[in-house]
């Protein structure tokens, strides 16, 4: 019963957060914030001092690991971090992991559902391929493979030399039995130095791996 309830909520969120729907911003809130918002990609340059202030109080190692909150509840600290830095890559990953771990679309004490934080990040920095990749990983973990593929493809278009994104897109393509394209992205990921053999092994098992150069 609980699993069915969560699934219904996720389907509703998927409809609400479709990029084609104008009210996604109303549902997930606008990006104005008392502190920020700042671009996480500039967190070691232009916004280094701002990032330090946020992380030392709200994104401690225990928060990042999803163990417990620092200044408040875990969900509250993640929310604060992601309102100040909407595209904070590591905080987005933690928010998604906690939601998956707790089997809930909205982490306790977070202001918005997990998907909203990705929606906000994409609205803030639509050209951030790491955000699209993290969102794709979340959708893939939920079993929403088609939506995950769309996000992975956007991520690869923005970050074509990122080995992890290429690898994960290959895994998603393998899931839908698109072996030819899975092989292309697998080979690219390995050429870029991705260390794990899992995707290659799965393609070998399916009889789809070859050692021809791309």
Question: What feature does the model see in each segment?
Answer:
Residues 94-97, 134, 168, 202:
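Canonical tetratricopeptide repeat
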Residues 24-76, 84:
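N-terminal leader/linker segments that initiate helical-solenoid repeat arrays
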Residues 91, 131, 165, 198-199:
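TPR alpha-solenoid repeat register
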